Amino acid sequence: MAKTTKSRKKKKSSFVDKHKRVLLIVAVVLVAMAAVSLPFVLTKASADTIIYIPKGTTMEALTDSLKKNTDDTFASRVTTLLKVSGMKVEYRHGAFKIAKGETALMAAYTLRRGEPSELKFTFNNVRTLDEFATRAGNKFEPSKKDFLKALADPEVCAKLDHTPDNIGCILLADSYKFYWDITPEKLLKNMYNYYVQFWNDERTQKAKKLGLTPDEVVIVAS
């Protein structure tokens, strides 16, 4: 009977020791993981910035962009996380905002899985299509040449109830929000939609009383 009791105590003691060892190993692993991940959590962006990812870019190009717009340490840690996660950067496309105070871990998630950011596009005192194309080309991925081509395309203009000669009338000076990789055709379509909303029945009737069409009002005002 005594031997049985001692045997049970030994088994219980052995179980407790094994349990303690497992807990110790788990604790060590957790501490190690925390030590490894801590720099990625503590490293933060020092200012708001936007990272542009062109279609078909490379990890090297993205790293250079991060270094240019943040700092070497932040860029290095974000890049490390992206590589470890297996990100295929060539499939990402757009402009991604990294806010001041955002950790390297959060920034990596934004670049890998986050939604692209819309860019505010404000213009006024634009008197020619060339000026508009210049501003749009400086703000978005398509070039000035791409915008000029769309503005001069009869088919593009016809879909917007205009011609290359009067397409400038839909470009109402205001603030808009578009994605960086928007096509010239889609941007013009969105601006045309705003133009239609602006020229509601009330404004159209006021123009009519003056003997003018909406486009003629725009031309006179410019």
Q: What do these predicted ranges mean?
A:
Residues 2-222:
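Conserved catalytic or metal-liganding residues and their short signature motifs at active sites
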